[in-house]
Design a protein with these regions (language model features):
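Sec-dependent N-terminal signal peptides of Gram-positive bacterial secreted proteins and lipoproteins
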Residues: 1-21
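Short, aromatic/basic amphipathic alpha-helical patches
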Residues: 199-208
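Low-complexity, acidic Ser/Thr/Pro-rich repeat tracts that form intrinsically disordered stalk/linker regions
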Residues: 14, 18-41
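GGW-centered surface loops in extracellular recognition modules
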Residues: 32-55, 210
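Ser/Thr/Pro-rich low-complexity tandem-repeat tracts
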Residues: 107, 119, 130, 142, ...
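Cellulosome-associated attachment modules in secreted, modular CAZymes
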Residues: 18-21, 215-286
Length: 286
């Protein structure tokens, strides 16, 4: 990288500089495009390539995985390709990408959002390991598997697992390193969103993590007793009172979703009123 930077600084009129070398039995090409340093490995077909490494300048908050570099279509992201790019916040992965290597986005400390296009079938082991600010991940319906520790330590993660996913690896979601002992522990107030009866629900149950099917839950049943009644309304009012007086809230993410009947992202007296209306309707057989 230092040699490449020296070459770039010496040729000011050139916006893209390339160098080639042999590695992994594939031709390696390094180039700079719009101040971003890329290294690719050309596949045997002579048309496609794997993105081996990427260095994004500190000024780059958003990045899109290129569809083409040096005339080659990029079809894969290699192991650790984006790892350690500490300033990038948003990454978009296009439909041309068919595979991703392990640890590809590991320790991207400022990463908050990732968007996948349809085409990816697997998120490998440690793919987003230790991305503490990662919150939004838009997964494609083509996805089949999520590898071991794929989102380990992603404490802010809030995403929905498509029903197409049939296998989820160990510690893939909702887990982080235990603070006072060896091993892993469930992230506080973590919630897995998925489909009832799917691999995501199975994973949540096995690991003691809250689960919700966003298309199939009992609205208002915040105490999880399989009925929406006055007890739920009382719980919602108690939560609202805490929030209003500055006392720490006690509802989990799951309870906040279930208790927010009017969809304004706030659990308050309006929601309690709607819960009571549901209870009254159910009680009278309406």
């Amino acid at each position: 990288m230092k040699l490449l930077s020296a070459i770039i600084s010496g040729i000011m009129a050139v916006s893209s500089v390339s160098a080639t070398a042999e590695t992994d039995s594939r031709k390696e090409i390094s180039t700079v495009i719009n101040a971003v340093e890329y290294t690719i490995l050309v596949n045997s077909d002579g048309k496609t390539a794997e993105l081996k490494s990427v260095y994004l300048p500190h000024s780059y908050a958003e990045a899109e995985v290129p569809t083409e570099i040096s005339g080659y279509t990029i079809t894969a992201i290699g192991e650790k390709a984006y790892a350690g790019n500490f300033n990038v916040e948003k990454i978009t992965i296009g439909k041309n990408i068919k595979s991703i290597g392990e640890k590809a986005f590991m320790s991207c400390n400022e990463l908050t959002e990732v968007t996948f296009s349809k085409g990816i079938t697997a998120i490998p082991d440690d793919c987003f390991f230790s991305c503490p600010k990662l919150e939004t991940v838009k997964l494609p319906t083509s996805l089949k598997t999520i590898g071991d520790e794929a989102f380990y330590g992603c404490v802010a993660l809030d995403m929905e697992i498509p029903s197409s996913v049939t296998a989820i690896g160990a510690n893939a979601l909702g887990m982080e390193a235990a603070t006072h002992e060896e091993g892993s522990t469930v992230i506080h107030d973590f919630l897995i969103k998925g489909t009832t009866g799917s691999a995501s629900e199975k994973y949540a149950l096995e690991n003691g993590i809250d689960f919700i099917d966003m298309k199939n839950f009992m609205a208002g049943d915040v105490n999880n007793d399989e009925t929406t009644d006055s007890a739920d309304a009382s719980d919602v009012l108690a939560e609202y009172a805490k929030i209003s007086t500055g006392i720490p809230a006690v509802f989990t993410k799951k309870q906040r979703i279930i208790g927010d009947l009017n969809g304004d992202e706030i659990v308050d007296s309006s929601d309690a009123s709607e819960i009571l209306a549901i209870y009254a309707k159910n009680s009278t057989g309406g």
